[in-house]
């Protein structure tokens, strides 16, 4: 994976202090089906991390309110740095004082159906529809 894709991610983490994947090892192969991961993250404030596989990384957003089964409910998703694909299996505790310090739980994961293009990630706000297969 080209270093530039994860440069912001790597700059924020001290991998000698955290068990989070650095993304510097052997690159995990992209899947044929686009994966998504939702992680419950009890950091400074409880939130959920939404990660969508695209172009060899997880594009990532922090969602401050929990997921809802009602499609009429709206949730603000704030884009954060891309994460390595290995982060899709991460659960554990990030040490206090480190970026994102707190407990990360794997809340849901699956694959997405339908075609989507790079322009889907341009701009500040996007509506994402996922269906578990």
What are these regions (language model features)?
Residues 1-133:
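A charge-rich, low-complexity, intrinsically flexible signal that marks solvent-exposed coils, linkers
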């Amino acid at each position: 994976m080209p270093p530039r894709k994860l440069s912001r991610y790597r700059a924020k983490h001290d991998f000698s202090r955290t068990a989070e994947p650095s993304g510097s090892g052997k690159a995990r192969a992209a899947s044929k089906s686009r994966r998504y991961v939702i992680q419950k993250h009890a950091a400074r404030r409880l939130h959920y991390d939404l990660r969508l596989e695209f172009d060899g990384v997880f594009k990532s957003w922090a969602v401050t309110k929990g997921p809802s089964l009602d499609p009429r409910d709206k949730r603000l998703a704030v884009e954060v740095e891309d994460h390595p694909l290995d982060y899709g299996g991460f659960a554990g505790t990030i040490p206090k004082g480190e970026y994102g310090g707190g407990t990360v739980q794997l809340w849901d994961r699956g694959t997405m159906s339908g075609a989507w293009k790079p322009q889907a990630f341009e701009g500040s706000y996007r509506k994402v529809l996922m269906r578990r297969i």
